[in-house]
Amino acid sequence: MDDTQSVFRLADLETCYADTDTWPDFNPTADRPLGNLPVWGGYDPSRSRDDASFVIVAPPLKEGGEHRVIARYKWLDKSYIWQAERIRELVGRYNFRHIGVDVTGPGIGVFEQIRAFFPLATPINYSVQLKTQLVLKAKELIEAHRLKWDAGQNDIAHAFLTIRQGVTDSGQISYSASRTSATGHADVAWANLPGLAAEAIGQPKGGCVVFIQ
């Protein structure tokens, strides 16, 4: 993996690897894998040949703690109704406090379905400013070693590495990802961003402060 053009450094991403078997409060085969502990969700819709991605993040219970990517899902060629039904099933298994949904493009259909059974669902309508805020939030957490995921899911690190910084025609900083066969357009990384939107930049407490534009 090469991080020469990436917003994220490979050395920082490698600190995100964790052995989920050492998480005593997490049992992925249980009806309630985290019991009644709170979780946040993030959804990135499918575009062109990309997968849709949904991630579940367990936020820290104490100030400065770790965010843990508990589960991630990739859905290809599935209708927005089918995807929303899978998320409905997950809402029955986890104690969601926040679900951020990218509604730019095809995500709006999934969002409308989710909102019917989870009114706290938050639409994420990307602007240059909002995308910058969310990328900086992920960078803040990763550099502070406060974001963890299963070491076997190294495609998550690959996805973050494909995110590059650019400049718009008007001179604003922007972020985008090149497409690869393994990561699409960084689908799982973009799914993490709406989920992590529940913690504001510079706020280490894990409280829910959602960016909406």
Language model segments and positions:
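Phosphate/oxyanion-binding active-site loops and adjacent basic polyanion-contact surfaces
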Residues: 50, 76-83, 184-190
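Mg2+-dependent endonuclease catalytic cores in nucleic-acid-processing enzymes, primarily RNase H-like
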Residues: 62-170
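Hydrophobic beta-strand positions in blades of beta-propellers and related beta-sheet-rich domains
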Residues: 52-54, 69, 175-177
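Short, flexible loop/turn elements at secondary-structure junctions
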Residues: 17, 45-49, 105
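Charge-patterned, long linear interaction tracts outside catalytic cores
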Residues: 163-213
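Gly/Thr-rich phosphate-binding beta-strand-loop-beta motif of the actin/hexokinase/Hsp70
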Residues: 33-60
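Generic recognition of flexible, low-complexity loop/linker segments
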Residues: 24-31, 40-45, 86-90, 110, ...
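ATPase catalytic-site recognition across NTP-hydrolyzing enzymes
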Residues: 1-43
